[in-house]
Design a protein with these regions (language model features):
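Conserved S-adenosyl-L-methionine
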Residues: 158-163, 261-263
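Active-site capping/gating segments
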Residues: 126, 247-248, 264-287
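Short helix-loop-beta connector
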Residues: 133-139, 238
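Rossmann-like adenosine-cofactor binding region
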Residues: 190-265
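Glycine-rich adenosine-cofactor-binding loop
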Residues: 27, 118, 137-157
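NAD(P)-binding Rossmann-fold cofactor-contacting core
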Residues: 161-187
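Phosphate/diphosphate ligand-binding glycine-rich loop within oxidoreductases
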Residues: 15-131
Length: 290
């Protein structure tokens, strides 16, 4: 239902009242997201007197932004760059996933008590399940230790994935990967290991032993369109499920090779949709009418 309304607007002027509760996106700069259209149409469909608006809030203003949540008695907010790793210290409570990720993308205001969570990993796991991919109790291999990759790794471990092999170049994010591995191994029953992406033989070995492979890097989208973190299709086998969290282009070089090898594949569009629907549930207590 919501998908049919993305980008069309939703006649908000017809439903704003004196009692309308506010939910916001706090980011800088604001880039045209689908979030306002998607959330507002879902609120209208289920009869919630909520309005979702975007606000430019930079890193120097996020503390004031959180105070505005309290002062204006907003129901909550989505938090995007550059504020995801900064906002947590101004909140009253963080969920385990947010604590482990060191990042927040959703805030819920319950009568002045602000709870921060991160729904990126939840969105990934729900999108995978929606596509018939269930890594619970199984092994996955993932490339990328940025924000999205970390959220996926943490949520997968919390949800019960048995083993995660993480690959990243030895850049600034490699240290973040080391921290994530330590947290997963000490706080969950999942076994996590970090490897250098330059070791392509090890990458193939881990992929050969995995149920799921995930690309959580930007390799495959502009300006790296047509490139892949996996060198060729010999790394894939039909039993391997492959997810590339990139959704523009819809079909990346990675997924093209995986499809040729007979793999079930998925792009990142579902992850984006389901992370938004997870936030909607936190604010309303009801599933989003997707």
């Amino acid at each position: 239902y919501v998908l049919s309304w993305l980008g069309k607007g939703n006649h908000m002027s017809e439903r704003i009242t004196f009692h309308t509760d506010l939910i916001g996106l706090m980011a800088y700069p604001i880039r045209p997201p689908s979030s306002p259209a998607m959330q507002n149409e879902a609120f209208a469909k289920l009869g919630y007197d909520y309005a979702y608006l975007a606000f430019e809030v930079d890193a120097n203003e996020i503390e004031a932004g959180v105070q505005a949540l309290r002062t204006l008695k907003m129901r909550g907010a989505n938090i995007s760059m550059p504020n995801k790793t900064l906002v947590g210290k101004y909140l009253d409570e963080l969920t385990p996933a947010a604590q482990m990720c060191g990042a927040v993308n959703t805030v819920v205001n319950d009568n002045g008590h602000l709870t921060g969570t991160i729904t990126d990993g939840v969105g990934f796991m729900r999108a995978a399940a929606d596509n018939g991919i269930s890594p619970i109790g199984k092994k996955m291999t993932i490339v990328g230790c940025g924000g999205a990759g970390t959220a996926i790794q943490i949520q997968a471990a919390l949800d019960g994935v048995s083993e995660i092999s993480i690959f990243n170049r030895k850049d600034d994010f490699y240290h973040r990967g080391e921290e994530t591995v330590q947290k997963i191994n000490s706080q969950t029953s999942c076994k996590a290991t970090l490897y250098d992406l330059a070791d392509l033989q090890k990458l193939k070995e881990e992929m050969d032993d995995s149920y799921l492979f995930v690309n959580a890097t930007g390799v495959g989208m502009k300006p790296l369109e047509g490139q892949s973190v996996v060198p060729d299709k010999s790394y894939f086998r039909p039993e391997l499920n492959v997810v590339d969290i990139i959704y523009a282009p819809r079909l990346t070089k990675l997924r093209e090779m995986a499809k040729e090898a007979g793999c079930k594949t998925m792009n990142g569009l579902g992850m984006m949709l389901f992370q938004g629907s997870a936030a909607f549930e936190l604010w309303t207590g009801e599933p989003m009418p997707i």
